[in-house]
């Protein structure tokens, strides 16, 4: 005879950011415009790069893909968060949870690889400008993009594979605002050792490899900039790197806080806040960071507006 404890879970209840009805209403009013700005801003970056011949370079090719990934990253998480603000109880089936987990990890991991690729692109442009056209040829750019997306899919398969092999027969309330693996592992019954270790290893390898690439690239970039005799050349080199460094610092700072810091050093609410930053806020900020601090993007924007008669 089947007991209550043997009943398998078929859906999860997402607890969200808060259980206060007033605060949920305030957060909905705040985060809905954030999501709209994220989608509109990143689509605008993609269209601007596609329609501006002067931006048809590897650097802006990678930026357009970063904008696409940011749309996917935010969309994998934000809609269900907005729904949780409007409902007392937000439920999601196991299949939906697996899909959200997979898409979130895939886009997040791809963003890591793209940020590393963009750092390598800046390294080649500043440290080996005469070899730039050969070392960043269309074939190599396509390879780097393909590898970034493949890496995202492989890491996502590690997470979703562990999730689908978990058994859930007890509590089904996820203490998060989306289906993240580690809160889900806490709800599983039976042995979950592999589900804890395997994703941690794959995520650590992604973070270490991409962050190492970024750090090494910028060490060489800084060395090359300091050797430049022209102040104008140094300023131009710094300006091309500042926006990327800002995006890297914001993204990796919050991701490392969530996935690297010892779990005992922070609370579940602190994890939620950090997760909001890197999944919801940063995808909105990236178009602003790369457009407001980039002369070429601003010039392309002015030319596009002039062509469409938006301003003289």
Swiss-Prot record:
Residues 47-54, 121-133, 218-237, 293-312 are cytoplasmic. GO terms for biological process: G protein-coupled receptor signaling pathway; sensory perception of smell. Residues 1-25, 76-99, 155-196, 259-271 are extracellular. GO terms for molecular function: G protein-coupled receptor activity; olfactory receptor activity. It is a multi-pass membrane protein. Disulfide bonds join 97-189. GO terms for cellular component: membrane; plasma membrane. Glycans are attached at residue 5. The keyword Transmembrane helix applies. InterPro entries: GPCR_Rhodpsn, GPCR_Rhodpsn_7TM, Olfact_rcpt. It is found in: Cell membrane. The chain crosses the membrane at residues 26-46, 55-75, 100-120, 134-154, 197-217, 238-258, 272-292. Pfam families: 7tm_4 (PF13853). Keywords: Cell membrane, Disulfide bond, G-protein coupled receptor, Glycoprotein, Membrane, Olfaction, Receptor, Sensory transduction, Transducer, Transmembrane, Transmembrane helix. Belongs to the G-protein coupled receptor 1 family. Potential odorant receptor. This is Olfactory receptor 5P4. It comes from Mus musculus (Mouse). The gene is Or5p4.
């Amino acid at each position: 005879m089947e007991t209550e404890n043997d009943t398998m879970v078929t859906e999860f209840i997402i607890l969200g950011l808060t259980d206060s009805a007033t605060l949920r209403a305030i957060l909905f009013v705040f985060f809905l415009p954030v999501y709209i700005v994220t989608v509109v801003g990143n689509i605008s970056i993609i269209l601007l790069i596609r329609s501006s011949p002067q931006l048809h370079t590897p650097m802006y090719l990678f930026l357009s893909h970063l904008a696409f990934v940011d749309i996917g990253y935010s969309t994998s998480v934000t809609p269900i968060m907005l729904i949780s603000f409007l409902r007392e109880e937000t439920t999601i089936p196991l299949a939906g949870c697996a899909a959200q987990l997979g898409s979130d990890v895939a886009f997040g991991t791809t963003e890591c690889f793209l940020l590393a690729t963009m750092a390598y692109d800046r390294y080649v442009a500043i440290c080996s400008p005469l070899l730039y056209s050969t070392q960043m040829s269309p074939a190599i750019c396509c390879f780097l993009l393909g590898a970034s997306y493949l890496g995202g899919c492989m890491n996502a398969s590690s997470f979703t594979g562990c999730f689908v092999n978990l058994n859930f027969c007890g509590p089904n309330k996820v203490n998060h605002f989306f289906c993240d693996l580690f809160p889900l592992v806490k709800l599983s019954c039976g042995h979950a050792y592999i589900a804890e270790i395997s994703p941690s290893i794959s995520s650590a390898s992604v973070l270490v490899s991409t962050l190492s690439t970024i750090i090494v690239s910028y060490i060489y970039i800084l060395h090359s900039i300091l050797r430049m005799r022209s102040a104008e050349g140094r300023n131009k080199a710094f300006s091309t790197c500042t926006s990327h460094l800002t995006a890297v610092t914001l993204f990796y700072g919050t991701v490392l806080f969530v996935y690297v810091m010892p779990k005992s050093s922070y609370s579940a609410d602190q994890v939620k806040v950090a997760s909001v930053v890197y999944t919801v806020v940063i995808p909105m900020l990236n178009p602003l960071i790369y457009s407001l601090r980039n002369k070429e993007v601003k010039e392309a924007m002015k030319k596009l507006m002039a062509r469409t008669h938006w301003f003289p």
